[in-house]
Amino acid sequence: MLPGEHLEEAAVREVEEETGVSTEFESLVCFRHWHGYRYGKSDIYFVSRLKPLSNQITIQEEEIAECLWMPVADFLGSNSIHVFNKTIVTAALNSPGVSPITIEGYEPAERFEFFMPPGAIVGN
């Protein structure tokens, strides 16, 4: 993430940089924290649901080896896809995820990020 960048902005930017696909952020589907992942450092992993605004893929070869569109059933049925990734896709299909919201009293908005499920705002 870039300094001052929110998660939703980073997700949209990273996908466009690495695949050439323009997207719109919809929700956060998954968050994973892995203690001591590499070099004794933690790894934080976010997965977002994004709506594609374009479909032409242009791979940034320094970052990724392969990128393609495929039917969800093929993805979930593939023996080469790790169970963690299948679990994330299943969660995205079965849950609306959590979306960015603003909460009164937390200003300026540039300093705060809140992600909540639909209908979670109280008293705004």
Q: Could you say what each language-model-derived stretch is?
A:
Residues 1-28, 48:
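The catalytic Nudix box helix
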